Swiss-Prot record:
The lineage of its organism: Bacteria, Pseudomonadati, Pseudomonadota, Gammaproteobacteria, Enterobacterales. It catalyses: Exonucleolytic cleavage in either 5'- to 3'- or 3'- to 5'-direction to yield nucleoside 5'-phosphates. Pfam families: Exonuc_VII_S. InterPro entries: Exonuc_VII_S, Exonuc_VII_ssu_sf. This is Exodeoxyribonuclease 7 small subunit. It comes from Cronobacter sakazakii (strain ATCC BAA-894). It is an enzyme of class 3 (hydrolase). It comes from the Bacteria. Belongs to the XseB family. GO terms for cellular component: cytosol; exodeoxyribonuclease VII complex. The gene is xseB.
Length: 80
């Protein structure tokens, strides 16, 4: 497992590690201190993932704004 301050290589790597942490926490077999450390790492990974998603969204909006003919509409998950 990467050290606390180490940045994950990619969004996908962070997501995979976060999923593993959730699985370990849900098992209920971890001692309290280890569970707290895992939870702390999970929060850190979730925040990093959120930042990466926001950056990706900004890049997409910039690319779309360069093509003025393409309408820019906010994403809504219910629209699918």
């Amino acid at each position: 497992m990467p050290k606390k301050n180490e940045q994950p290589a990619s969004f996908e790597t962070a997501l995979t590690e976060l999923e593993q942490i959730v699985t370990r926490l849900e098992s209920g077999d971890l001692p309290l201190e280890e569970a707290l450390n895992e939870f702390e790492r999970g929060v850190q990974l979730a925040r990093q993932g959120q930042v990466k998603l926001q950056q990706a969204e900004q890049r997409v909006q910039i690319l779309l704004s360069q093509n003025e003919d393409a309408p820019l509409t906010p994403f809504t998950p219910d629209a699918e």
